[in-house]
């Protein structure tokens, strides 16, 4: 089913400060940040040509969206195999699923201190187990029911391969004790439905309070080969700055362990739930086909949603992401490819609303409402071959859409209005003096884009600005002048080309191709 949600209208103040162009125009007003960037030599206006482009070649059908109708609470419940026979055992922490958290004497010592002796964990093995069974079979210093339906885990819980743990509607709340160092590890199948999962301070009898990135918070991690399903309940107060302990994580094992275990990639559905006050609201690494649908991510610490390294075919849809305290609302980073970021609402985040980062390609970013973020609406860093379609980018503190060192970016039918800098901004930046690993995260100082349809209105410095593009194609974009007193004018490399551009775009209703008449590689010599 190809359902394209018609985004709710947003009330905008009228912007009547310039001339409305019927089709498109291009502005080269460089935002202030550009002067501070180290970049390869740029080309002058004499080194660019303006010609008519093929309108037919720019035609593109609306993108086909994935069918979301099957991702429901009922479908999650139907996946649970309630086969009896699961076993519960307490054992020492020295197990494969815990190696990342107990390796080295320093980390093991932490659990010894927290548990007051040689550390143990609870292991779910061999079949289906409901959470209430743990309280009936384990001592209170490991797991207890404190009030009817409210349980506290005082040691880590591990779901072993082949086992299923169901935390369901008979559980009001599962609390993971901060003082005792409890956390939840899925190495099999985990279902959390109609209940609450929270990091808990027994000392304060309250949810754990964030005290800094290095202070322990409980967390949930699901390893390679696992399935994780969270449906219709809140998750809160989890995660800290330790590998794979970021909050709610679905991740392949480390490369060394993966070579030995050869587990398939993990997957899962997180639907219709609330994730709040978590170090990373969501994190994944080398995960496939994960679905994040209909969730609220609010007031999380570093990121709201953060899929990472080589994850594929993710669906990030119909989520509400806001109030992220340190960085971005939604970010996909390092070769997160072939995924859908659609019909989300992301606003009031510390930096950008949506980010594609570090060679994340062949993704669709469509029909999102992105507004009042403290940096850009949508940002692309070193991420080429992506389609940006039908988004509404309103009143962001910097650019509506920004792309750096990214080529073949198709920007169709977007509304980018009253952003404080530019509606659409493309630029290059030389990153060679930074500390990034260029083998892992290569870059090329090139930018190119196609802009078709949509509207750029009332943005602070210019509708569109670009720095030394490989090529630009423009067609059928409505524009109002920026709020600056000089109105809508071409500057920079296109200043001398203004008459040619307007003649094609406005008078002759043509598509415009702007590209260099010299080889950019030669121009940099």
UniProtKB/Swiss-Prot annotation:
Q: What else is noted?
A: This epimerase does not require calcium for its activity. Probably cannot form G blocks.
In terms of Pfam families, this protein maps to: Beta_helix
Q: How is its activity regulated?
A: Inhibited by zinc.
This protein is called what?
A: Mannuronan C5-epimerase AlgG
* Keyword Protease in record: no
Active-site residues (renumbered): 308 (proton acceptor)
PbH1 repeat residues: 287-309, 311-334, 336-358, 360-382, 383-405
Kindly list the organism's lineage: Bacteria, Pseudomonadati, Pseudomonadota, Gammaproteobacteria, Pseudomonadales
Q: Give the gene that encodes this protein.
A: algG
Signal peptide start and end residues: 1-29
């Amino acid at each position: 089913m190809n359902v394209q949600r018609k985004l709710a209208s947003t009330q905008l103040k009228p912007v009547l400060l310039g001339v409305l162009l019927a089709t498109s125009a291009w502005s080269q007003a460089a935002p202030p940040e550009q002067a501070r960037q180290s970049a390869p030599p740029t080309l002058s206006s004499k080194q660019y040509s303006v010609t008519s482009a093929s309108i037919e070649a720019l035609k593109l059908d609306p993108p086909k969206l994935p069918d979301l109708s099957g991702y429901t609470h009922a479908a999650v419940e139907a996946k649970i195999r309630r086969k009896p026979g699961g076993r519960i055992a307490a054992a020492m922490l020295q197990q494969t699923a815990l190696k990342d958290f107990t390796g080295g004497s320093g980390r093991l010592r932490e659990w010894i201190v927290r548990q007051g002796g040689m550390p143990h964990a609870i292991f779910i093995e061999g079949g289906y187990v409901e959470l209430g069974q743990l309280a009936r079979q384990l001592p209170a210093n490991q797991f207890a029911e404190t009030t009817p339906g409210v349980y506290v885990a005082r040691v880590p819980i591990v779901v072993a391969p082949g086992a299923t743990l169901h935390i369901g509607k008979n559980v009001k709340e599962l609390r993971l004790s901060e003082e005792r160092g409890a956390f939840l590890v899925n190495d099999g199948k985990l279902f959390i439905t109609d209940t609450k999962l929270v990091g808990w301070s027994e000392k304060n009898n309250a949810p754990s309070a964030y005290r800094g990135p290095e202070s322990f918070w409980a967390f949930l991690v699901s390893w390679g080969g696992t399935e994780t399903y969270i449906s219709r309940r809140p998750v809160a107060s989890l995660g800290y700055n330790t590998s794979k302990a970021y909050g709610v994580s679905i991740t392949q094992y480390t490369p060394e362990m993966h070579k030995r275990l050869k587990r398939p990639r993990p997957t899962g559905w997180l639907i219709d739930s609330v994730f709040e006050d978590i170090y990373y609201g969501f994190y994944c690494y080398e995960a496939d086909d994960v679905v994040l649908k209909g969730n609220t991510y609010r007031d999380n610490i570093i990121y709201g949603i953060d899929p990472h390294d080589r994850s594929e075919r993710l669906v990030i849809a119909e989520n509400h992401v806001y109030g992220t305290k340190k960085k971005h609302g939604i970010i996909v980073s390092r070769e997160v490819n072939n995924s859908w970021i659609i019909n989300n609402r992301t606003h009031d985040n510390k930096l950008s609303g949506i980010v594609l980062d570090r060679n994340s390609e062949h993704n669709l970013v469509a029909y999102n409402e992105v507004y009042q973020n403290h940096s850009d609406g949508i940002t692309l860093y070193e991420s080429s071959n992506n389609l940006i379609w039908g988004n509404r980018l309103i009143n962001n503190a910097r650019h509506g859409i920004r792309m750096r060192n990214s080529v073949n970016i198709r920007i169709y039918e977007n509304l980018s209005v009253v952003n404080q800098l530019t509606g659409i901004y493309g630029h290059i930046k030389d990153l060679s003096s930074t500390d990034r690993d260029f083998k892992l995260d290569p870059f090329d100082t090139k930018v190119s884009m196609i802009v078709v349809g949509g509207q750029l209105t009332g943005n602070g410095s210019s509708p569109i600005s670009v720095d030394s593009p490989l090529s630009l194609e423009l067609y059928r974009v409505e524009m109002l002048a920026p709020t600056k007193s000089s109105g809508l004018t071409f500057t920079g490399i296109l200043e001398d080309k203004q008459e040619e551009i307007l003649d094609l775009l406005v008078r002759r209703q043509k598509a415009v191709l702007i590209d260099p008449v010299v080889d950019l590689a030669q121009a940099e010599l």
